[in-house]
C-alpha cells in the first residue's frame, strides 16, 4: 500500500497553497520538528480535527524467544501513540471502501 512521504507532502503544499518548493519543504520539516520537540519535552500534541500524539511508557514485561521458547525480559520503554480525533474518524467512516490492490 502506498504511503504519503514528507517529500510528497511538500509537493502537495507547493501545488495547493502556492508556496515555492523550498518553502514547502521547510514548512513540512519545521512542522515535524516542532511535533518531535514537543513530544521530547513530555508534552502531548493535539491537532484539532485530526488527533493527538503522546508519549506513553510501557512497563517491563516477560517475553519469549520464538525459536527457543526461552523467557526473556523486555525492558520498559517509551513509545509514541496516536489517537485519531472524532472528525478524522468520521471522515474515514464516511468514505466508500476501496478494495486494496493485491
From Swiss-Prot:
Gene Ontology CC terms: cytosol
Q: Name one Pfam family in it.
A: Bac_DNA_binding
Q: Which UniProt keywords apply?
A: DNA recombination, DNA-binding, Transcription, Transcription regulation, Translation regulation
SUPFAM superfamilies, A to Z? IHF-like DNA-binding proteins
Superkingdom in the source lineage: Bacteria
Q: Which GO terms describe its biological process?
A: DNA recombination; positive regulation of metabolic process; regulation of DNA-templated transcription; regulation of translation
The Gene Ontology terms for molecular function here are:
DNA binding; structural constituent of chromatin
User: PROSITE patterns, per this entry?
Assistant: HISTONE_LIKE
Subunit structure and binding partners: Heterodimer of an alpha and a beta chain.
Q: Which family does it belong to?
A: Belongs to the bacterial histone-like protein family.
Role, per record: This protein is one of the two subunits of integration host factor, a specific DNA-binding protein that functions in genetic recombination as well as in transcriptional and translational control.
Stored HAMAP family = IHF_alpha
Can you name this protein? Integration host factor subunit alpha
Q: Which organism is it from?
A: Albidiferax ferrireducens (strain ATCC BAA-621 / DSM 15236 / T118)
Amino acid at each position: 500500500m502506498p504511503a504519503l512521504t514528507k517529500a510528497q507532502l511538500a509537493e502537495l503544499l507547493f501545488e495547493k497553497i502556492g508556496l515555492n518548493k523550498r518553502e514547502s519543504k521547510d514548512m513540512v520539516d519545521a512542522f515535524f520538528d516542532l511535533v518531535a520537540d514537543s513530544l521530547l519535552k513530555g508534552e502531548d500534541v493535539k491537532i484539532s480535527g485530526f488527533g493527538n500524539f503522546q508519549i506513553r511508557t510501557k512497563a517491563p514485561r516477560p517475553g519469549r524467544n520464538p525459536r527457543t521458547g526461552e523467557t526473556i525480559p523486555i525492558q520498559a520503554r517509551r513509545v509514541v501513540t496516536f489517537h485519531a480525533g472524532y472528525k478524522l474518524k468520521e471522515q474515514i467512516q464516511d468514505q466508500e471502501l476501496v478494495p486494496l490492490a493485491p
